[in-house]
């Protein structure tokens, strides 16, 4: 697990480096599917003092199997998403400014241009609000459930992120670094959408044929963007 702990540590350290977190906000995890174990950031530990050895290993029920700290308070959300979506290898949660602003507004981040379409096939959805019962009960587990409810049967890697109403963004990917990459992009396109709609409140979504082209040339079966 040392290699995965190092990867998760590095991915967590990328959050302040890319300006996605303040203080101890945010967390990144990754899963070892063969062993059924998840590595995640410890709860409330400052990034400046954090080490790879501090990463916490939990099983799929959330039981700590390695580590001296409590795991992130959002662990149950991560585990619920891993259980539902076998294609996920890494998950990140932040309170990055612009993506969180869309979450607080209760609005999906609209697909307005090709930067968005290069990574997200359509709008980045916003969940419904959790009920008082859901919040007072198993809050973090229910956060995962409302994300799954919103995504439905969609392929999560085609829309590798979501904003949870009145909370903030979650993003995911093939591994921890890919998840952070998608979280960085989500914050950037959230900012772009806010600026664009401020300039032109009547701005329409990106044309579907242009969105399809940009997404498929990077992620489709005949993708040709980048190097083999």
Curated annotation (Swiss-Prot):
HAMAP family assigned to the protein according to its UniProt record, in alphabetical order: UlaF
Positions that bind Zn(2+): 74, 93, 95, 167
Binding sites annotated in the UniProt record for substrate: 26-27, 43-44, 72-73
Reaction(s) this enzyme catalyzes, per UniProt: L-ribulose 5-phosphate = D-xylulose 5-phosphate
Keyword Zinc-finger attributed: no
Family to which the UniProt record says this protein belongs: Belongs to the aldolase class II family. AraD/FucA subfamily.
EC number annotated for this UniProt entry: 5.1.3.4
PANTHER family xref list: FUCULOSE PHOSPHATE ALDOLASE (PTHR22789), L-RIBULOSE-5-PHOSPHATE 4-EPIMERASE ULAF (PTHR22789:SF9)
Highest taxon in the source lineage: Bacteria
Active site residues of this protein: 118 (proton donor/acceptor), 225 (proton donor/acceptor)
GO terms under cellular component: cytosol
Keyword Transcription tagged: no
GO molecular function: aldehyde-lyase activity; L-ribulose-phosphate 4-epimerase activity; zinc ion binding
Inducers of expression: Induced by L-ascorbate. Repressed by UlaR.
Disulfide pairings: none
One BP term from GO: pentose catabolic process
Cofactor requirements of the protein: Zn(2+)
Function description: Catalyzes the isomerization of L-ribulose 5-phosphate to D-xylulose 5-phosphate. Is involved in the anaerobic L-ascorbate utilization.
UniProt organism field: Escherichia coli O7:K1 (strain IAI39 / ExPEC)
Gene designation: ulaF
Pfam families named in the record: Aldolase_II
UniProt keyword terms in alphabetical order: Carbohydrate metabolism, Isomerase, Metal-binding, Zinc
Pathway assignment: Cofactor degradation; L-ascorbate degradation; D-xylulose 5-phosphate from L-ascorbate: step 4/4
Cofactor binding: number and manner: Binds 1 zinc ion per subunit.
InterPro entries hit by this protein: Aldolase_class_II_sugar_metab, Aldolase_II/adducin_N, Aldolase_II/adducin_N_sf, UlaF
Protein name from the UniProt record: L-ribulose-5-phosphate 4-epimerase UlaF
